[in-house]
Amino acid sequence: ETSFVSANSCENGVSYRTYVGGVCGFNGEGGHSFTDITSNIDVKGSTCDVGGLFGIAHYGNNFVNCSSSGDVEIYAADDIDSAEEIGGIAGVWHNENGTTVTFTNCSFTGTLKTNITEGVDLSNNTITGKAYSSTGTGNLIIK
């Protein structure tokens, strides 16, 4: 049986960003390296930013030899955009200030599931979900 982590970010009918992952929900920006991380943890989050290892992968960080095999689920997304903020390694990647988020030799063998299915495409979310940005600058590199 697999271990699990679950986070609910809804209170009094208001939804907030969930930021939950099997290892870390929110990692800070700039120059951190996460190397040789393996997890078999099921992760459930209520609204968005739900990943097998990290809820959000911030700009300037590098992820090397990371793998996740647990199931990842968003169970109360408010809309299609929130439902697509799910990923096998990171729920979203934050591109800001023209910097790069890099994933090298990372893999996911679990399943992705969200409460909204119509109009939601998770086929490219095995490493990370969609970009979350206020400026639209920055890059995602997956090797």
Regions found by a protein language model. Give the residues of each.
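Surface-exposed loop/turn motifs in large extracellular/passenger domains
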Residues: 1-143
